[in-house]
From Swiss-Prot:
Classification via NCBIfam families: msrA
EC number: 1.8.4.11
Broad EC category: oxidoreductase
Chemical reaction(s) catalysed: L-methionyl-[protein] + [thioredoxin]-disulfide + H2O = L-methionyl-(S)-S-oxide-[protein] + [thioredoxin]-dithiol; [thioredoxin]-disulfide + L-methionine + H2O = L-methionine (S)-S-oxide + [thioredoxin]-dithiol
Record's keyword annotation contains Oxidoreductase: yes
Source organism (scientific name): Methanococcus maripaludis (strain C6 / ATCC BAA-1332)
GO CC annotation, single: cytoplasm
Gene name tied to this protein: msrA
A GO molecular-function annotation: peptide-methionine (S)-S-oxide reductase activity
Protein known as: Peptide methionine sulfoxide reductase MsrA
GO biological-process terms attached to the record: cellular response to oxidative stress; protein modification process
Positions of the catalytic residues: C13
């Protein structure tokens, strides 16, 4: 596929993150999985037990002619709490920490600029990590498009 770019964010439970991004015009596909850990092909169980060092992430393939990386960053910042280490709501553990994984120097610079803007406007310390993307490991199939499959679930973004 040509003319696409990839963005990866960790912002708590990957089910909610995927549901948010998959509906955005310009997003071609989303997939949930794990990034940033120290073992190959981790299972959900290994990640949840804190044995792998991975973060739950949403992998987003998008068309940069329709959707800008800055727009994705804005959705990232506005739809989770970047001030709580290793936690999002009721979900607690390092796998739920706030992360931006970048693929290019441009993404890194845009992420850092957005981080500074958010920090400037926040009374609390922003704990989001900005890290170079590493291997992405897809989560098990039952995690993919979870809320879409469970069409009786209601999410408010």
């Amino acid at each position: 596929m040509t003319n696409t770019e990839t963005a990866v964010f960790g912002m708590g439970c990957f089910w909610s993150a995927e549901e948010l991004f998959r509906k955005i015009n310009g997003v071609i596909s989303t997939e949930v999985g794990f990034m940033g850990g120290n073992i190959k092909n981790p299972t959900y169980g290994q990640v949840c037990r804190g044995r792998s060092g991975h973060i739950e992430v949403v992998n987003i393939i998008y068309n940069p002619k329709i959707l800008k990386y800055d727009d994705l960053l804005e959705l990232f910042w506005n739809n989770h709490d970047p001030t709580t280490p290793n936690r999002q709501g009721w979900d607690v553990g390092e796998q739920y920490s706030s992360h931006i994984f970048y693929f290019t120097e441009e993404q890194k610079l845009l992420a850092e600029k957005s981080f500074e803007k958010i920090q400037k406007n926040s009374e609390l310390k922003i704990v989001t990590a900005i890290r170079k993307a590493s291997d992405f490991f897809p989560a098990e199939e039952y995690h993919q498009k979870y809320f879409m499959k469970k069409n009786n679930c209601i999410l408010n973004f």
